[in-house]
Design a protein with these regions (language model features):
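A charged helix-plus-loop insertion that forms the helical arch/lid used to bind
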Residues: 93-107, 151-153
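Catalytic domains of carbohydrate-active enzymes, especially glycoside hydrolases
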Residues: 37-49, 118, 125-130
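Short, acidic/polar
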Residues: 27-39, 111-122, 207-214, 277-282
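Short glycine-enriched loops at secondary-structure junctions
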Residues: 27-30, 79-87, 91, 129-139, ...
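A substrate-binding/cap region within the structured catalytic cores of diverse enzymes
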Residues: 106-124, 138-144, 148-149, 163, ...
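Second-shell residues forming the walls of enzyme active-site clefts
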Residues: 12-16, 25, 52-71, 75, ...
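Preference for extracellular/luminal or secreted protein segments
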Residues: 1-41, 275-553
Length: 553
């Protein structure tokens, strides 16, 4: 008898309750049999990642299969689609929407709502009904490795109003918003993918700086909120908020009055995995007040079974109150019912191609119903963002900040410095390549490796100039002799090697044009030609390409 059969045979009621609060991942572009079987028994749904998406147009068929396999109301089909640097649907080429930092820079809440309505419309067309967005984190640490351009900014009021606008936009399109990362991840210097983070300061600071955006999201009707694996010593002690009853049941539900679904951040993240292991973290999270458990991108069928078995065993052993598990399952069931009603009321999906995109919003899945008018985004080869006016590109254009002299490019050499990977964003398509002359773009690492392109080896090593290998400022300068030189960076302030490389290039070539596609905390000398896009989305790159004369405006 398999572990799967063991658990269900031993206590089928508890097994179904446990399945009813899980949204596991799966490998590949089609759900395997175990996922389809579990959906038939009452599994809450799934979480999609880039590994599940070969191309946007491919997504509708597997999401339809997930719905067809599901017993009762349709499944929760969740994804991280924030716009900007965090995209799963458009990871190959980059998002056609600017991210939160760019939208916060523009500070037009109507535009933020329109962009998120467009994101929601794209997701709804693909059969995705739950977006783990927006980020409501107030940026307090310039070196925030987890948040950065995912935040609307460093001002609590600005973040609050744009969080509310983003929630409204997504839910205008019939997609549930899951606001994150409660109680606020923007003032930490640790990425919870790698270790537990701590918010320094007391509850007074938390209430003043970090909580107002979540209060704004609640007022806007956010369907769900995601706590983070970080601790606030005065509130949670040594525990992360994600397993703290004081944070979830006391603060979020009791003080802030949130009555929607509380969704765990990925349980595979080291902040909780290293402390408890995934199964025990799941039990502690539900006991503290979590309703829906996200296992994470790498979660396997074995992880799913282990979590389900741990929940069942915890109820049997008295470590988890059975009524708490029932409460969580009931709340998720109501979420699924609301999503199913929203989908049935929506216009039929028209599919996505290089020439068209899907339907506009059909009404909010939140507290009220909001009629959604036509929206659209900047075009990309994926077919995303081709409904109505190019709101994504419009927003990206408005966000770009320009300083220094305008220069006309002549046979440019474009150096793109690959940053250290942000785990939440992963590897995604970025840069000026789609608009640059053939052979002009060279991707290098800050550590001095040519990642693609040719002809940029060290000046004294002709052999390495034939392809990927070592690269230094001298080699770049030699290759750019008599040509325009453009350097493109992301979050240069975080990496001394990136700053050193750019500084060496500027010392020899003060006519260099520097394009910052992250946060512009590190600035070149006054008089440098400089563009800051506040994110590395395809839309932001397109806007920069226009200003550089690489793309028609």
């Amino acid at each position: 008898m398999s572990q799967d059969t063991d658990v269900r045979a031993a206590d089928p009621v508890l097994g179904r309750l446990a399945e009813a609060i899980l949204i596991p991942p799966f490998p590949g572009t089609a759900a395997p049999g175990w996922v389809l079987d579990a959906l038939g028994r009452g599994l809450a749904g799934v979480t999609l990642y880039g590994q599940n998406i070969a191309a946007p147009g491919q997504v509708s068929a597997p999401t339809a299969a997930l719905r067809e396999a599901t017993a009762g109301d349709g499944p929760v089909i969740a994804i991280d689609e924030e716009g900007g640097d965090v995209t799963r649907v458009a990871f190959a080429e980059g998002s056609p929407y600017p991210g939160n930092a760019a939208l916060g820079m523009v500070d037009d809440t109507a535009l933020t709502r329109a962009v998120h309505q467009a994101i929601g419309a794209d997701l709804a067309t693909l059969g995705i009904n739950f977006d783990m967005a927006p980020c409501a984190d107030v940026l307090g640490a310039a070196d925030s490795p987890a948040i950065g351009t995912r935040s609307f900014g460093a001002d609590t009021g600005l973040v609050s109003r744009h969080t509310a606008a983003a929630v409204a936009g997504l839910q205008d399109a019939g997609v549930a918003a899951c606001t994150k990362h409660f109680p606020g991840h923007g003032r930490t210097g640790t990425d919870t993918h790698e270790a537990i983070a701590t918010i320094e300061g007391g509850l007074a600071d938390l209430r003043l700086v970090d909580l107002p955006p979540f209060e704004a999201a609640i007022r806007a009707g956010t369907v769900a909120i995601m706590p983070s694996h970080l601790r606030v010593p005065e509130l949670t002690g040594d525990l992360p908020a994600s397993v703290s009853a004081a944070a979830l049941t006391g603060l979020l539900r009791g003080e802030l009055g949130f009555t929607g679904v509380i969704v765990s951040d990925a349980l595979e993240m080291r902040a909780t995995r290293d402390l408890f292991g995934i199964p025990r973290a799941a039990v502690l999270a539900v006991a503290a007040g979590i309703d829906l458990l996200c296992l994470g991108r790498e979660g396997s069928e074995d992880d799913y079974l282990a979590v389900r078995e741990a929940l069942v065993a915890a109820v049997r052993d008295g470590a988890l109150d059975g009524e708490r598990l029932e409460e969580a399952a009931d709340r998720v069931a109501r979420l699924r019912g609301g999503l199913a009603r929203t989908r049935s009321a929506a216009p039929a999906a028209v599919g996505m191609s290089s020439d068209s995109a899907g339907p506009v919003g059909a009404g909010s899945v939140g507290a009220g119903s909001v009629d959604a008018g036509p929206v659209g985004v900047g075009p990309g080869a994926s077919g995303l963002g081709r409904v109505g006016p190019a709101v994504g590109l419009v927003a990206a254009r408005r966000a770009v900040q320009v300083s220094g002299p305008r220069r006309t490019l002549s046979h440019p050499v474009i150096i793109e410095v690959e940053p250290r990977e942000n785990i939440a964003a992963g590897r995604f398509g970025w840069g000026l390549g789609p608009w640059a002359p053939a052979g002009s773009v060279h991707r290098v690492s800050a550590a001095g490796r040519l990642l693609n392109g040719a002809g940029l080896g060290p000046a004294d090593d002709a052999a390495s100039a034939a392809g990927p290998g070592p690269v230094d400022a001298a080699g770049i300068l030699a290759a750019a002799a008599g040509r325009s030189l453009v350097a493109v960076v992301r979050d240069a302030h975080r990496d001394e090697q990136t700053k050193s490389l750019v500084s060496a290039l500027l010392a020899a070539r003060p006519d260099l044009i520097l394009v910052e596609m992250g946060l512009p905390f590190w600035r070149p000398p006054e008089g440098t030609s400089y563009l800051a896009t506040y994110g590395a989305s395809r839309a932001s790159a397109h806007a920069a390409a226009e200003l550089l004369g690489l793309a028609p405006a």
